Amino acid sequence: TKPVFFKRKRIETLDDDFLDIDFIENSSKKIVILCHGLEGSSDSKYIQATAKLLSLNGYSVAAMNYRFCSGEINRQLVTYHSGKTDDLHAVINYVLPNYESIYLVGFSLGGNLVLKYNGDSLFSLSSKIKANVAISVPVDLKGSSIALRRSENTLYSWRFLRTLSKKMHLKHHQFPKNLDIRQLKKVKTLTDFDDYFTSKINGFEDAEDYYLKASSKQFIPNISKPTLLINALDDPFLSESCFPVREANESLNFYLMTPLHGGHVGFISKG
């Protein structure tokens, strides 16, 4: 399949960093912001397929690339993580003047961002945000981290760790005094990586603290816009705690779909 044609725009952040956002723009006053998963980008097949579908149906699209995910190292020590909603907020503010309706769609880590952003009192939500969809989301990061340690997920974890480790070597060259790269030798799981690197460079105490504060599950009761979460029952990345049934039953705005099949982000065809 031919790749979707995006027009790239660079947004400068308040902390002197940048975000590369890939747009498909048409005359529509409706835009969908797409948020990718761990170690993904606007090149990810599920982002490409979704962008293509939305564009064919008359929506403009803004596909985020988180810090250090657009093929270029970011300027600051901080990178992206499951709770980094301030960068999503920056993208929303960037598109706000040009559109009447904004929709947020997030996959996996990106879905956690979308849910957390909508339920976090840190942000006053624009009335232009109309609805949200989150797909294959580890709403309980600790539970998901335990699921990822299961033997059937070894290959997935290894693939993530391989690219994350490469990034840390580059970060070490950029900030030699801020990163103890020797800790990489101790990293055997994603939890280890979050303990030694993700948490430390992003202002958390350790993986436990990061998972506690960044998990979106605690923010779901505060969601005020129509929001759909689709988590497949056969998703190997999700623990039982990643299916917020009670929260959905008690909310007027949050809806949960739990199809039997779909795996992890397996609903999206290749387009």
Residues of each region from the PLM?
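N-terminal cap/lid segment of alpha/beta-hydrolase-fold proteins
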Residues: 1-25, 268-270
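Short beta-strand element of the alpha/beta-hydrolase
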Residues: 29-37
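Conserved alpha/beta-hydrolase
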Residues: 40-43, 51-75
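Catalytic nucleophile-loop/oxyanion-hole region of alpha/beta-hydrolase
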Residues: 67-103
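Alpha/beta-hydrolase-fold enzymes
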Residues: 103-202
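Active-site nucleophile elbow and catalytic-triad environment of alpha/beta-hydrolase enzymes
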Residues: 196-219, 225
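Short beta-strand/loop motif that positions the catalytic acidic residue
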Residues: 223, 229-231
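Catalytic histidine neighborhood in serine/cysteine hydrolases
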Residues: 249-266
